[in-house]
Amino acid sequence: MGKKRRISNKLLLVGAIFTIAIPSVSYAEEVISPENFKSSSNLYEGRNTTVLKTSLYPDTYNYPFNQQFISKLKEANTTIKKVDKRDDENPIISTTLSFIRHMNSEDYKSAFDLTSRSLQKIISKEWLKSYWEGLPVQLQAGSFIEIGEVTQKETNPVHTNVEIQLVFEKMTVPLLIKLDPSGKIDDFQLSMSFSPVAERPSYSKPESFVDKEVVVGSGAFPLPGTLSVPKENGPFPAVILVQGSGATDQDETAFALKPFRDLAEGLASKGIAVLRYNKRTYEHGLKTQFSPFYTVDKETTDDALLVTQFLKNEPLINKNQIYILGHSQGGMMLPKMIEKDQNKNIAGAIVMGGPARTIQDVVLDQFEYLFSIGAMNLDQYKFYKSQFELLNDPNFSGQNPPKDFYLGSAVFWDSIRKIKAAEMSKEQKTPLLIIQGERDYQVQSKIEIPLWKEQLKERDNVDYQLYPKLNHFFTEGDGEISKPDEYYSPANIPEYVINDIAAWVQGKSQLN
């Protein structure tokens, strides 16, 4: 197997995404060590860092945080429902089973024939072979044994999602396969599915709002979403929810947490319409992976602005009261959205756990904390520190990166490395609400909030709200600073956060 195909396997270990770590960093999808970066960095030039998947930490699976998740995958081996021998009459399930069976029997042509025309433009039979052979190696899972439970999950106007459990010697791994309306496989990625997940929050009042299935955009990257609209008489102010980095669904599902579902249902229960959507890197992971010269604007900014224009045409929405809430990297990109909002569609913006500084500076502080609690060793910390120093060099070029730059697409990094959200917001006029959990170890309030306040001290339309008990995903916990494994515990965003956001939006709406 050639080196390039081995690297491609690593690019495809797509799972849940850790907002504000390395851009498009996964929780537990990559196992690329610094040594592997160095031996293969030239293969990444011009690639899409959105699915490059440089690991949350190098050698991700070795950390206690992710070992806890892996141990849960291993436990699933004893309880999985075997269906490989079953003849399933459901054509969606049948196609999914056939796809895996063909690859396991090394019939990659038949597997390839089950994929959509759009996917066939970017992958090949040889690529499928490389992916399948490399999967257990990258996961350190041992030999493939059999297919486990197959579940038809979400169906939206763009894709029908099927989760299939792949039973290996050492663990059972969920693979999320997306089929287009014609029944062809259009995308697939590892799924960091987790059980149990947080239940619907008590403050959600489903009887008070209606969920409307929508599709934003067309062409290669249509994005399915949900518009939650109050049942009262409109028009209503609306909030658009923009995720952090990586491949996240419309609920911004992070292990046991669903923060965007909580926000959407909570705000809709209080008379505010909310639109949330699957991120491009989640709905079209493989296509974005192979898109040349992928930038942070393509990952985050442009789709968010497309959604604002979409809402302008919704009859139940107050066209002058469209707000954007950006979480984590989404919050960091809000000033860029405001800058590019030529039609002045954005009435106000809510920065939810968004950094004031460059992402590489924020991540370095995050890694220092992880090193201090034993979640990262010294060599790994030094490796990333050296990489971030290259990004901070004014002469860094995405088109001609240093030979010792190993973090993936230099084009993507060049598009994001200079963004300083607080500084960009200094001269802008759009009202801001900046909310921050004080226990957040990923975007640390003791560093970021003073910088926001210093840069915006001359502005009179910026409000701040700090929450002593909340972490990066705005759920409560104990201790001065949160730890990564906190995200495994099902929890909801507290109602007091919903109340604060609703009061701010409704207050601004009444002024106009």
Predicted regions and their residues:
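Short solvent-exposed beta->alpha transition segments
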Residues: D84, S94, K109-P157
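N-terminal cap/lid segment of alpha/beta-hydrolase-fold proteins
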Residues: S195-N233
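Cap/lid segment of the alpha/beta-hydrolase catalytic domain
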Residues: V242-I272, R276-K298, L370-F371, E476-E486
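Alpha/beta-hydrolase active-site loop
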Residues: F293-E314
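Accessory cap/linker subdomain of secreted extracellular hydrolases
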Residues: G348-E427
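Short beta-strand/loop motif that positions the catalytic acidic residue
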Residues: Q428, I434-Q436
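Short alpha-helix in the alpha/beta-hydrolase fold that links the catalytic acid
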Residues: Q444-Q455
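Catalytic active-site module of serine/aspartate enzymes centered on a nucleophile-bearing elbow/loop
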Residues: F473, G479-N512
